[in-house]
Amino acid sequence: MKQFLSFLLLFPLMVWSQSDYGKAEKLFEAGKYDQARPVFESFLKENPSHLKTMEYLGDIAGHQKSWDKAIVYYKKLKQLKPSEANYYFKYGGVLGMKAKESNKFAALGMIGEVKESFEKAIELNPKHIEARWALVMIYIQLPGIVGGSETKAIKYSNELLKLSLVDGYLSRGQIDEHFKRYTAAEQQYKKAIAAGSTKTGGQMLSNLYKNKMNKSVKKN
């Protein structure tokens, strides 16, 4: 009986907490991160191992370019649930952004861990498309002397092609465009559009024409 009465006393608080949490999730989805963050932070103080809340806070920190904060959240998530591919992907992503904004020497010390994080995400989820995209972009953007490799970029692009025609064509187009093979890139983007990527493929093709080939997109 005492336990039942205690439950009744706590019930309004539980409902209120769930209501607040739901509102915070809607604020997050609407991109109102400053309003959502305090609710998630308060909830996490009372539930320090709540994975979803930790992920929300990591995502908010990432959106706000607070790389160090995001790194802390995702690192903790990896420790709490080392089998979740997305935690490694997100950790690698924010670590990569920190590296990009750091000086060259500091960045070099992070690149290895960034790659390993994306590779781990693929190991845990062999169909992880975003991690392969990240590796494609890393390998074409890095100079060869510090680990860049067109061969490895093509390897991951080919893997993408097996998972998704659109992502395979678009990623190969990005590789060709980066190495100034503009006609080849044009063909890859057109293949992506034909495969269904009318928006992203169309935008990439338009940017290629405008910035690299001095052409206009033909209207049907």
Residue ranges of predicted features:
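Canonical tetratricopeptide repeat
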Residues: 52, 56-59, 90-93, 134, ...
